[in-house]
Amino acid sequence: MKEFNCPELASNWLKAGKILLHPTEGLWGIGCIVDSTAINLLSNLKRRNNKKGYIILVPNLEDVRRLFQLKPKYFPTLHNIWPGPVTVIMKTKNNSLSLVSDDNNNVAVRVSDHYHLKNLLTFLGQPMISTSANISGKQNIFDLDDIRNTFNDPNVALFNKPLGKLKKASTIIDIESMQIIRK
């Protein structure tokens, strides 16, 4: 499996429509750019239904403001939880994320505080789709060798940087209702 230690090279791999295993705050992730061919490849690798939503990662709050409809009353909440391991469901501003939004234009988005992931996202310069690096419906995989074996495909590379210390998936909240979807 191809490996990258440099965020710029890893971002170029993604921009070519390929799939990247990457560290997050808590779990190994696997992701791609918002592109129908890349999303189909990712879904096939994970054996995942394309109708199930993906999380979008962006490097900062400015990108969130640019891509999503945000009421000013939500700014304090978002400033308190981001950057960090909290994913927020919110409405997109336009159709730029239509490949990953639900019927109501909602998308799950996170501004990560994982140093290496933030660097990767900055070099990428566009939203990145991410999900846990496991087969859909199966247990999370923490061992990197097991992940490499599970996703051994010429279109998959590894951004080989340390995993965060959280050891679980991110919390997910709905910004409109403030309901916790996943703890």
Language model features with spans:
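Active-site-adjacent structural elements in enzyme catalytic cores
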Residues: 1-183
